[in-house]
């Protein structure tokens, strides 16, 4: 990440970084941060904001069935004494790997802010904010944003290469 102090900022909060890494490994091109926002996709709230703005987020409901590959965003699943910011309800995330009628299994990094990863079974509709589904229609548009100035480009960005 571009910040020198990112390890201090994230502390043990690396579930979003785990999800980001998994997405990059399978070939998704994702922005590093939410355009015109201080949020980076190293944090759950940034994923929440970004996915809503990109129309990739579906709020949890009895009519929505998650599928393998969906990204799940949890709400108040981390105990308050282990949270860095108790005012942020979207506090954990993972990747759905299996769905059954009782719930789903998700691959998660930093489960319960205990600095460990694993595959864990979660019940449907319990502490779930919603799901991000990045389908074949998703197209990376990060080139449109100048993250330093906040300006929106209208032409594709071509970096200059020193000769």
Model-derived regions: residue spans:
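Aromatic- and glycine-rich peptidoglycan recognition patches
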Residues: 76-163
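N-terminal capping segments
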Residues: 1-32, 155-163
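Alpha-helix initiation/capping motif
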Residues: 15, 43, 123-126
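Short linear interaction motif-like sites in intrinsically disordered regions of transcription factors
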Residues: 2, 15, 48-51, 144
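...with weaker cross-activation on analogous glycine-rich loops/strands in unrelated enzymes
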Residues: 7-12, 29-114
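A generic structural signal for solvent-exposed, polar alpha-helical segments
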Residues: 7, 20, 24, 53-56, ...
């Amino acid at each position: 990440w571009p910040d020198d102090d990112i390890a201090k900022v994230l502390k043990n909060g690396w579930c979003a970084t785990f999800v980001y890494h998994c997405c990059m490994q399978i070939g998704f091109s994702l922005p590093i941060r939410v355009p015109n926002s201080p949020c980076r996709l190293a944090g759950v709230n940034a994923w929440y904001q970004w996915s809503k703005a990109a129309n990739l987020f579906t709020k949890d409901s009895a009519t929505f069935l998650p599928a393998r590959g969906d990204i799940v965003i949890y709400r108040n699943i981390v105990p308050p004494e282990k949270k860095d910011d108790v005012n942020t309800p979207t506090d954990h995330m993972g990747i759905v790997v299996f769905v059954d009628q009782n719930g789903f299994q998700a691959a998660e990094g930093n489960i319960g802010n205990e600095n460990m990863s694993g595959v864990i079974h979660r019940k449907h509709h319990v502490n779930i904010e919603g799901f991000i589904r990045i389908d074949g229609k998703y197209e990376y548009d990060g080139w449109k944003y100048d993250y330093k100035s906040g300006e929106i480009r209208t032409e594709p960005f071509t970096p200059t290469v020193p000769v």
